[in-house]
Amino acid sequence: MYSISFQEDSLLPRERLAKEGVEALSNQELLAILLRTGTRQASVFEIAQKVLNNLSSLTDLKKMTLQELQSLSGIGRVKAIELQAMIELGHRIHKHETLEMESILSSQKLAKKMQQELGDKKQEHLVALYLNTQNQIIHQQTIFIGSVTRSIAEPREILHYAIKHMATSLVLVHNHPSGAVAPSQNDDHVTKLVKEACELMGIVLLDHLIVSHSNYFSYREKTDLI
């Protein structure tokens, strides 16, 4: 009968986390904690490493669908759901941290931030950012998610959140899943409608941004509509 002993430098991930702090753990160890168990064919550490080997970077995990996660060796439906929930929670925490009282100094700065959030979305998302008198973001609201042809903005809904959060200005942002950021006639129409509605309420439409993974279009920079 053999007894198994662990050396100080080979503590199980949960024990290492408790002893040394979460920052001390490798990506493999963190993922192993989330996966919890292995299979008959592979240990949880082997599965974690296989998952990481399938990624070009950790950000790929955020982009993966439930089906894509399940296609990875050793990842069943339950593990895939749990992983996606954890990834989304981490994303929301990060978004909240960067959102809190962030001052908007330029369209380029804001576009870069929203590219990270919307650039890889496969459906069109229309988002409104609401600002105070110091041009600090006080609220972010997704107005619409859908196909390009169905993405019709309703000024009344956009202004509802502006009034609710006592915003003095707002920025519209939406993505083009195709990757091309040139505005459509519908984009121009929506921009005009929202600007007119904002003016009636004494709210400033600072910009309307169109973003893709690698590019952006600013109505304020490129047109005279704003």
UniProtKB/Swiss-Prot annotation:
Annotated source species: Streptococcus pneumoniae (strain ATCC BAA-255 / R6)
Residue spans crossing the bilayer: none
One GO MF term attached to the UniProt entry: metallopeptidase activity
Annotated CDD domains: MPN_DUF2466 (cd08071)
Residues where Zn(2+) binds: 174, 176, 187
Motif (JAMM motif): 174-187
Biological processes per GO annotation: proteolysis
Phenotype of the disrupted gene, per the record: Mutants show normal uptake and processing of transforming DNA. They also display normal sensitivity to DNA-damaging agents.
Keyword Oxidoreductase: no
All copies of domain MPN, residue ranges: 103-225
InterPro entries referenced in this protein's UniProt entry, alphabetically: MPN, RadC_JAB, RuvA_2-like, UPF0758, UPF0758_CS, UPF0758_N
Keywords for this protein: Hydrolase, Metal-binding, Metalloprotease, Protease, Zinc
Protein name: UPF0758 protein spr0996
Top-level taxonomy: Bacteria, Bacillati, Bacillota, Bacilli, Lactobacillales
Family affiliation: Belongs to the UPF0758 family.
Domain of life: Bacteria
